[in-house]
């Protein structure tokens, strides 16, 4: 059977591995390196360069050298306006889509096409190593990649001539590599800080089972951002001295970016580094040179906000997994950016233990992808991988509240159902509004789609039973079905990639949910109280109509007055009241009064019925001849 390779398609570097003799092996490229820069360039002669050779000529050819393309893949232009200004090549808006301009060829590329060139090189190098054509692969993506980004990655594989058998999350792949030979159960935290993305996953691993307990992350945080901090520092310092902004010169920007990356790497092992860029620019007075010293302390100061941003997803993942830091057995570092001493110190401070450095952070994801490829090819047995959905899914219910059906970090595939009803009398259709997010109110969450179920027989509100079912398969495709249990009629909607969200929306939802938790809870409680008040009014009116003349005039007047007062306080259809304008203290008091009045009326009706029945039954009761309709009064006490 043909070999299936595992590929880590990274922002900065990529890597390919394969299972050989039951063990994963990283495949060196044609140049002899185990990782390949994710860089593609086109020369003025039209030649295509990929990898190290493309990276080496970037300074001389900045406008035709494409790097960090992973930040653009699967995204609309309005989602990457900030990133578009941080690269030396032109990023164009073509009908809302991202295109990369290549002046050397006089054409524009989609990001998928550039990524495909990197994948094609990895495929060719793997084919030479294995001595056979490679046509199938497992490719990794950040855990927080949305559906369009995942699909774009699959498209890149297709362009490269690969059948992508599976897209798996990078932290999950890393856990496979770490835990392949582990027999004892361990709870591990994978801290994955790469070139352009940051993921945190907590998993239970052991004896072939890899279960994701929680995942969190930031899709706009990585080594590139650390480089950018150095670039800005160098550029601002130079501008202060010379009055020239080097970032406006594409060639100078490329040189600054390379120098920043080199300085960042050096500062992981030394306390200071020299940055020398002769002839960085020129004026009428002659050439200008950049010569500066950067210390590790200054670098950490420049990047303090980025380092702090790494803290939040770790804390969120621990909270979602319902674990304390003491329950984490091992911390596995993934991605080249985890070599930064300040990052390692942060991990140690957050989790109270030294990180496990037994795996190569540049290769571990590709190794994990190769293991998953081995599972799919039948080479690796007894491996069970259980992943999760990153955000809660639900529907909008009365009062604009989001009712969650599948909580975030639920293991997929999964299927869950809830039964809902109508909100008004005689309602013949319901609109199902599918939502994703962590906020209490529907308006604050991501709308995934709406559909309508028609043909519900007219009935009093609360009578029809509408069963709403959420079904997520292993590929992350969400199907929502609404079925009227009375008639059997149903309607459904298929939402491909329920976790598809624009730039940073996932992180924003979680952050806002934390910040606004108290306010959300209070607002939800108010809406629930209002709904309960409306329901109580409806029940009271229904009871009055059903009992008719059995209710005394005084009781009827009292109930009618209480209903009117409660309706006036919460607002009616004709005169709606904003939720914040309602006095909920008075509403609760009126509800209590109305409830007591209903109990009183109910007791009176039963007493009247008993007294009228009691006249005829007392004589027959004395003779001992009990009929079928005899009612026997008995006292009983509840035992606890």
Curated annotation (Swiss-Prot):
It comes from the Bacteria. GO terms for molecular function: ATP binding; ATP-dependent protein folding chaperone; unfolded protein binding. Induction: By stress conditions e.g. heat shock. Pfam families: HSP70 (PF00012). InterPro entries: ATPase_NBD, Chaperone_DnaK, Heat_shock_70_CS, HSP70_C_sf, HSP70_peptide-bd_sf, Hsp_70_fam. The keyword Repeat does not apply. Keywords: ATP-binding, Chaperone, Nucleotide-binding, Phosphoprotein, Stress response. Residues 605-640 are annotated as: Disordered. Coiled coil: none annotated. Residues 627-640 have a biased composition (Acidic residues). The modification Phosphothreonine is found at residue 197. Acts as a chaperone. Belongs to the heat shock protein 70 family. PANTHER family: HEAT SHOCK PROTEIN 70KDA. This is Chaperone protein dnaK2. It comes from Thermosynechococcus vestitus (strain NIES-2133 / IAM M-273 / BP-1).
